[in-house]
């Protein structure tokens, strides 16, 4: 008979086929004993837990009635509900609720549907004492609770509830602030202890936190042993730096992190001296460091604001330039290319200036030839001239410099030069001539009084004396500088007297609308016209065209090629730009040479010139436009149909110019200079007869006046009687001077200009608010018999 070993019974007898081993039997026996002991321990633990639970349940409760009420909250609520129902005269409801909730009644109160409370079951709790209120404590409690709940949830509430809620919030904020400052002070104290800088000072957390935040308060620590200077010894094994994240102060030096070492501690435990002793470049994480603006240094990379004088990353001799803080450097696209300028060179360093003074002769000539760049007009962009460097076949945009070397000869000139520097323009006052509109205010008038040397060699004159910077294909910073010598293929005329037109235009916005005048005789130059102060005899102020902050742009009439000039009509075709008269045979040497005396050749050629037209259109969107025209000893043709020219007031002749609807215009009621037959206006916006205006004693324009003052070279007024005329009281306009009715009889003979180049003062004609239309601006057609180069001084659009 064989026995089968069962794994579930290890103590079973093994079969006879298998050898019996005493060691295996012992192991099985020990495991059985361990299991038995474990089961007994588990039973004992369970019994102990049950006993503890029974003891907790069987513990005697507190004999205090208040404690019983708190432990039995539901019964208390039921009692208050029963009290509320009783005081609300709901007796049947209260009796039914008391019966269902098993509530006892008062001793003196008999139940409605049952015996007294003594006969009730003993398990029911006795009726506890309820706060006696007229309408029931539950109702009053609920009323207060609901009022405060509405106040806290922004649903209204009574005034007292709102005041109470604000007081509670204020107390909570103060506690929160004090708690946060105490935590902050504890962190700082802990950090000081770890660094060995704390000597068991009694510190108020509020004072310490305020002190570390930089607020001026009373000293938080009472100094002990002031005369002693203990050396702080860091604790061994502890890190020196702080690892806590203190409130978010911006670190002035982000490269210094947790590896920075704290500076030497102050002599005592006063924390007021720790913050200021820190270096800006060395920060300890955890100390409040404010981000003050750092001073620029030479190691300042791109991106940090730095003064131009502190760094010089250029590879050439170019010295740093201080640009204005509120203005950007003008790009070549921001400037027109049809404006000449006077000679000026960019600033050079001391070494280059010394070399330029020492070297002369052939070496200097060769250097000038090598550095000369031919400036050509761009094919598509009228505002960005292109330069062609010697040896290259590509044209690159020219970068126009704005460095001034010339020094004017008066304080007024210095002021104007400083204004030109602010706008980033070049000096145009060092070699320019005077203008009749700038007499007494322009430095060019003072400079023109000095005797100038006659230049015999025209090759020495330079019309492209502005520095240009070209960028090659490899991206190098090579600078090509135009010297004072003109290119060999450039022809420059030495005519001193050339009329010019100054238009106040925005160079950036009206770049594409600028008159594309590309010169094939002289190179274009960039300059800025000086700010002039001219007497405005009209009641409306003057506003620049297009831009209110940029200087006027001066353009010579001779810098226009034949491609843009119509010889038949004498007009210039420009896209949405101003149209100006042109004389392609006359070149300009300076934009301010409009008032120089006429030479003998110009005097002889007065009768040989073809009449030209000046068609001026104001910019789109201007509600008020003023046209200031300055003429000198010229003839005005009021219309093409009128062939009889009328002289300006020379020798007693009276200026007669009529303003009205132009018969040549097909644009509606746009008023221009018209024939003398149109004398009666048909609307408020139409023109008036100037002759009738001069001979009248009152103003015809509602808000305007006409002023014409003809003076002799001796600055004596030929007008016998000038009366002051004021405008309407509704408009705050300045009073103007209007000639009286006898102006025609009191005009004396005026000295005419001869070959001796006598100074002849200009005659000012100002037309204001002529033919204004609501949607589109007017067109002004001014026909000039171009018999003198200096007749047409300038046209200034202000609107």
From Swiss-Prot:
Its main location: nucleus. It is found in: Nucleus. Residues 41-55, 307-317, 341-353 have a biased composition (Low complexity). Residues 73-105 form the LisH domain. One of its GO terms (biological process) is regulation of biosynthetic process. GO terms for cellular component: nucleus. Residues 270-285, 318-340, 371-396, 460-480, 584-593, 660-675 have a biased composition (Polar residues). Residues 37-68, 101-127, 255-406, 431-502, 568-623, 644-691, 705-758 are annotated as: Disordered. The keyword Transmembrane does not apply. It comes from the Eukaryota. Keywords: Activator, Nucleus, Transcription, Transcription regulation. Residues 354-370, 482-497 have a biased composition (Basic residues). Belongs to the FLO8 family. Required for diploid filamentous growth, haploid invasive growth and flocculation. Putative transcriptional activator of FLO1. This is Transcriptional activator FLO8. It comes from Saccharomyces cerevisiae (strain AWRI1631) (Baker's yeast).
């Amino acid at each position: 008979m064989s026995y089968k070993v069962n794994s579930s019974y290890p103590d079973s007898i093994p079969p006879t086929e298998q050898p019996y081993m005493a060691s295996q039997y012992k192991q099985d026996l020990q495991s059985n004993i361990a299991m038995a002991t474990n089961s007994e321990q588990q039973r004992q633990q369970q019994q102990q837990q049950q006993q503890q639970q029974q003891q907790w349940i069987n513990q005697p409760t507190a004999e205090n009635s208040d404690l019983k009420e708190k432990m039995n909250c539901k019964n208390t609520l039921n009692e208050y509900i029963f009290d509320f129902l009783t005081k609300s005269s709901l007796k049947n409801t209260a009796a039914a609720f008391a019966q269902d909730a098993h509530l006892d009644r008062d001793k003196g109160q008999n139940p409605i549907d049952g015996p007294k409370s003594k006969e009730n079951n003993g398990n029911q709790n006795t009726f506890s004492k309820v706060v006696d209120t007229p309408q029931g404590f539950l109702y009053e409690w609920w009323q207060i609770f609901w009022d405060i709940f509405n106040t806290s949830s922004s649903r209204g509430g009574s005034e007292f509830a709102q005041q109470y809620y604000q007081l509670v919030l204020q107390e909570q904020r103060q506690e929160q602030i004090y708690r946060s400052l105490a935590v902050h002070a504890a962190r700082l104290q802990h950090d000081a202890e770890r660094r060995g800088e704390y000597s068991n000072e009694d510190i108020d957390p509020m004072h310490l936190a305020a002190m570390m935040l930089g607020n001026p308060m009373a000293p938080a620590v009472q100094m002990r042993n002031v005369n002693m200077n203990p050396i702080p010894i860091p604790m061994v094994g502890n890190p020196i730096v702080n690892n806590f994240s203190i409130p978010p102060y911006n670190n002035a030096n982000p490269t210094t992190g947790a590896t920075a070492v704290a500076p030497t501690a102050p002599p005592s435990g006063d924390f007021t001296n720790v913050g200021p002793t820190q270096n800006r470049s060395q920060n300890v994480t955890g100390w409040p460091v404010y981000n003050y603006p750092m001073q620029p240094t030479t190691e300042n990379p791109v991106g940090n604001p730095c003064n131009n004088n502190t760094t010089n990353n250029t590879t050439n001799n170019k010295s740093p330039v201080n640009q204005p803080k509120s203005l950007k450097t003008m790009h070549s696209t921001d400037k027109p290319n049809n404006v000449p300028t006077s000679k000026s060179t960019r600033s050079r360093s001391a070494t280059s200036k010394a070399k330029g003074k020492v070297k002369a002769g052939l070496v200097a000539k060769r250097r000038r030839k090598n550095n000369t760049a031919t400036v050509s007009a761009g094919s598509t962009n009228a505002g960005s001239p292109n330069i062609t460097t010697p040896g290259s076949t590509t044209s690159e945009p020219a970068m126009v410099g704005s460095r001034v070397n010339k020094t004017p000869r008066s304080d007024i000139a210095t002021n104007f030069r400083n204004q030109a520097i602010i706008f980033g323009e070049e000096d145009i006052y060092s070699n320019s001539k005077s203008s009749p509109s700038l007499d007494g205010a322009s430095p060019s008038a003072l400079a023109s009084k000095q005797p100038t040397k006659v230049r015999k060699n025209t090759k020495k004159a330079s019309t492209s004396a502005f520095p240009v910077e070209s960028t090659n294909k490899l991206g190098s910073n090579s600078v090509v500088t135009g010297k004072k010598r003109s290119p060999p293929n450039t022809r420059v005329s030495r005519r001193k007297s050339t009329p010019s037109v100054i238009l106040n235009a925005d160079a950036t916005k009206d770049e594409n609308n600028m008159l594309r005048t590309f010169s094939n005789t002289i190179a274009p130059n960039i300059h800025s016209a000086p700010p002039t102060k001219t007497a405005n005899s009209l009641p409306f102020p003057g506003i620049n065209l297009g831009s209110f902050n940029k200087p006027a742009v001066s353009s010579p009439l001779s810098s226009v090629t034949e491609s843009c000039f119509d010889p038949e009509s004498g007009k210039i075709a420009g896209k949405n730009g101003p149209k100006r008269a042109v004389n392609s045979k006359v070149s300009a040497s300076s934009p301010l040479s409009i008032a120089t005396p006429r030479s003998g050749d110009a005097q002889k050629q007065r009768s040989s010139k073809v009449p030209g037209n000046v068609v001026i259109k104001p910019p789109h969107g201007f509600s008020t436009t003023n046209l200031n025209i300055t003429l000198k000893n010229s003839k005005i043709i009021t219309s093409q149909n009128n062939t009889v020219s009328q002289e300006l007031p020379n020798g007693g002749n009276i200026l007669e110019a009529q303003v009205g609807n132009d018969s040549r215009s097909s644009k509606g009621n746009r008023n221009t200079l018209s024939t003398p037959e149109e004398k009666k206006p048909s609307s408020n916006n139409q023109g008036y007869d100037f002759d009738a205006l001069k001979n009248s004693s009152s103003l015809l324009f509602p808000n305007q006046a006409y002023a014409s003052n003809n003076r002799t070279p001796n600055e004596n007024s030929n007008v016998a009687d000038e009366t002051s005329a004021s405008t309407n009281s509704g408009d705050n306009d300045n009073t103007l001077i209007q000639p009286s009715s006898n102006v025609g009889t009191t005009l004396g003979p005026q000295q005419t200009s001869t070959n001796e180049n006598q100074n002849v003062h200009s005659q000012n004609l100002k037309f204001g608010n002529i033919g204004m239309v609501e949607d589109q601006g007017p067109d002004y057609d001014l026909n000039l018999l171009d018999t003198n180069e200096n007749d047409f001084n300038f046209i200034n659009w202000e609107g």
